[in-house]
Amino acid sequence: MNSQGRYSAKKRRVSTPRPAVVPRQTSAARSAVNTGSASFRVVFLVFVAALLLAGVAYGYVTFWRSVPVVVNGEHVDVRIHATVEDMLDGNDFFGVKPGRLLSVSGNVIEEDGGERCTVAVGEGDNAQPLASEKFSQTEVAEGGIFTVSDGADVTEPHAETVEPLAPGVQMETGGAIQYVKQWGKAGSHTVWKGEKSGEVVDKGTIEEPQDLIIGSRNARPVGSKKYIALTFDDGPSRYTQAILDILAQKRARATFFNLGTSAAGNPALAKAVVDGGNELASHTNAHKNLPTVGADELRSEIVTAFDTLEGASGFRPQMIRAPYGAFTATEWARSADLLSCNVLWNIDTLDWKRPGADAITKTVLNQAFNGAIALMHDGGGNREQDIEALPAIIDGLRDAGYTLVTVSELMELDGTFPQDVVQGAVKMPEDADAPTVG
């Protein structure tokens, strides 16, 4: 260390290394290197080309080549993996015609609105139909056999509902007393309504309806005795009281079919019928020919008469006799819930022709049988001949062994009429349905 406190160092010579000398390549060596590089490139290019060719070949075989199929007996080439839809589109559907679009009732809406075509896969009896919705999902197999034909007709879109099916009405004939033998019950059926056409069609019954059946029978009282019912129409009138008096004197009973309009004008006589032990029934309100009136008017004719008779006598009947006896299946369908029975007759005295008291009497006596119902009148015209004939009729019938009863008593003596009909207490069951008529 010197006086300044520093170390002194000796200078040393440092030798710098010389660069290495690279031997220079000869021309032969350079040629060998170039040849090797070129060979590599050739091999590489050949390899790449081979890959490309292999890819193209694979793509061709796998994706682009055509495969043979048979359509309608003709050979057709189709791109591999094509669907049936592709095959059809690419061949203009082989010239077949589309089906039609039909309404729910079968009318043509569009000539070409149906299935575009129909396709079956396979040959002969082994051919299977292919649904149109599977055309785009089904691949055409090499060697496949197809039959392409005209498209099927298609029914328009529609709403389907289940609707009630109204019962019909059946009417027996041949008897003097008509009544409900079987109540009707609705069934059900399928209904289609077309979305385009608006048509509504019945597509089939689900449950059959039960028809309303109207029985028609004569009363046949059982036992050894004979019974007959005298009936009087069109009252009450000024002749009614005389007839009631004769019945009372003879201790006989009859059935009176009063008109509502007549009872409204003679309420005391309507009450006198009931008070005398006779049967009060309805001849409707205004003696209209019921098959010629509408449903509402028909029901009004029946109900108004019942109301009037009840107001006059205190008794509400259910028994009617339709004017002229005209009460068809249509009238029953429209009003079966209102009445117990419609009473016709077995013996027509034709008293309205005024044939004379003797003729009226002979008609009843000559035509009488057990269970018979005889038709006479206490209103609607001059009824003096009926009044004159009545005593002889009663006496003659009794001499022949007959007991005079009301129509309800006649049915009771028969023993086979429904009790609600006999008693005038018919009520339509809650599960019953009325027929639909025009």
Where are these regions (language model features)?
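N-terminal Lys/Arg-rich, disordered targeting/topogenic segments
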Residues: 1-38
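Hydrophobic membrane-insertion alpha-helices, especially the h-region
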Residues: 43-58
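Eukaryote-biased recognition of intrinsically disordered, low-complexity regulatory segments
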Residues: 56-76
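Short, recurring structural edge motifs at helix starts
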Residues: 72-78, 131-135
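LysM (lysin motif) carbohydrate-binding repeats in extracellular/periplasmic proteins that recognize
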Residues: 80-117, 121-126
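N-terminal pre-catalytic segment of deacetylase/amide-hydrolase enzymes
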Residues: 106-116, 121-128, 135-229, 238-241, ...
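Active-site beta->alpha N-cap acidic-glycine motif
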Residues: 199-293, 297-301, 306-308
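Catalytic domains of cell-wall/extracellular-matrix polysaccharide-remodeling enzymes
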Residues: 242, 264-265, 288-403, 407-424
